[in-house]
Amino acid sequence: MIPELGHLAMILALCLALVQATLPLIGAWRGDRQWMSLAQPAAWGQFAFLAFAFACLTYAFMIDDFSVAYVAQNSNTALPWYYKFSAVWGAHEGSLLLWALILGGWTFAVAIFSRQLPEEMLARVLGVMGIISVGFLLFLIVTSNPFTRLLPNVPADGRDLNPLLQDFGLIIHPPMLYMGYVGFSVAFAFAIAALLGGKLDAAWARWSRPWTIIAWAFLGIGIALGSWWAYYELGWGGWWFWDPVENASFMPWLVGTALIHSLAVTEKRGVFKSWTVLLAIAAFSLSLLGTFLVRSGVLTSVHAFASDPERGVFILAFLLLVVGGSLTLFALRAPVVRSQVGFGLWSRETLLLANNLILVVAASMILLGTLYPLVLDALSGAKLSVGPPYFNALFVPLMGLLMAVLAVGVLVRWKDTPLRWLLGMLTPVLVASVALALLASLLWGDFHWAVLGVCLLAAWVTLAGLRDIQDKTRHKGLFKGMASLGRSYWGMQLAHLGLAVCALGVILTSLGSFERDMRMAPGEAVELGGYRFVFEGAAHHEGPNFISDRGTVRIFDGEKQIAVLHPEKRLYTVQQSVMTEAGIDAGLTRDLFVALGEPLEQGAWAVRIHIKPFVRWIWLGALMMGFGGFLAAADKRYRMKVKTRVRDALGLQEARA
């Protein structure tokens, strides 16, 4: 009965989504306030029904209701309860229900927190989000119903959750990623609503920007969590593989980064209006592309769900409809909102435009490398692999250029900046950056140009931020001046510092890692990177749904024992899958990583040992960027009720066609 109620709730949510997708838009077109007012209650009801459907599916997992096909395929009586909970979104049908729920949640949040918007604008925004909901709910109900029954042939037990997904990181990684993916639908909806109304002004950018920043922050943290999971779970110490599905989440993040900066220019200066709406369309379109890649069956990946062709065709059709429709609307309406506001060469507008172009080129390069092998295979049957050499050769220089531009962009002013003043600000920053980079290279030991270059760029970005703080607080005193700066400013500073930290982590762990694969018998020791690793053998261990050989490795720094690690080789009994669980001694400046390979004769094992310097800085920097986004979105100016348009408050002239 509970699964049937969940299925009914999805159908009712679809009905409300249809109402939300049609009547408010018609009402905005006709100027009918009653029809426009239907948008908010429809959004509330849709979210409530989706939450109920999700709760029904969760309940089915918790009570081991194997009459539900999705539960039988992804759970087991021996599965711990917390993995039963994460199994709700562990495969295609449940993950799509989670997607629909999060979309409903974003829509509900917009309906609640955007009441200060003009009535027509809010009706259009919620109407566009309703159209997106209709597409996903139709896909969910028609092709991917998670409540399908196995009656009367109910299995006695389930097939168990994929062992790769039985990990804490995979409990939180997909929801965070989906919050970002789906969150870009809000920016998309604001852009389409503004196009429909012909008002891509500073007010639109101000309303849209906090939602976009929050989605960007969630997506960035989700990507970082996925990288962290791959590092410790897959057993060989890698943290980024340029996997097509990794790329599919990274591309909208890059375009989203460009979008939040472009929105800032539109909000402050009323320029880049058409470009900004194009970025909003691109960010959400790339999110849909990621959905297609994961669920269409065109990829073989640890991330991809096995799916039938019908699902792929449905998502591809929806993707083409959204992209084609939005670009057609853009082509028709963009000329209406052209701006005639000018700015100089050495201005923040120019530097942010350069920022945008670099990020879009980087995303386009990744898109080409991801899709070209798929298109070639589909058209000719030829197999081609585009791997890390291609991506690294193009992406790394672009990010170096981005960091160089970023530091200048922080210091320049809106509209125009005197070149002499700018050089006076940048010269001490450059001198100090060179000195710090040389010092860091000396401390690193082995000289490497890449280490010197990235240390220089990281110092350049960090010191430029400090120079800007000093400039903004010089009249009020340091502490009083810092207190007067808004959360948006501090969020920007934290995010930029996070980029510098992440870049340092990437280059230092890439060039400074030690790795060794060897045979180790009980009692045998090996020296690596100044540490001594002593293998004491492996013992049998039983878990709730697996058996394992658990090794013991003691690590010494000189004569001092600093860690005891327990890497495992697990056999998940239901699916007979063998998994490697690494033992990791984590530190701020290095990780000691030990993984078991295959058992050998006389109690010996193949053992892999890594020393990863500064690898945690990669995820620390990503978290700093994400939390910087949340801090910026919490700025008080985004929480103030605005009764007049921002463009009027800023004194900007009306854009002419």
Could you describe each region identified by the protein language model?
Residues I11-L25, W29, S95-S227, G235:
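A conserved hydrophobic secondary-structure block that centers on an alpha-helix together
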Residues Q46-F61, M129-V142, L279-S287, N356-L367, ...:
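Hydrophobic alpha-helical membrane-insertion segments
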Residues M1-Q34, F52, F66, P244-P252, ...:
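Contiguous transmembrane helix-bundle modules in multi-pass membrane proteins
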Residues W29-L50, A109-S133, L196-A217, W242, ...:
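Membrane-interfacial loop-to-helix junctions in multi-pass inner-membrane proteins
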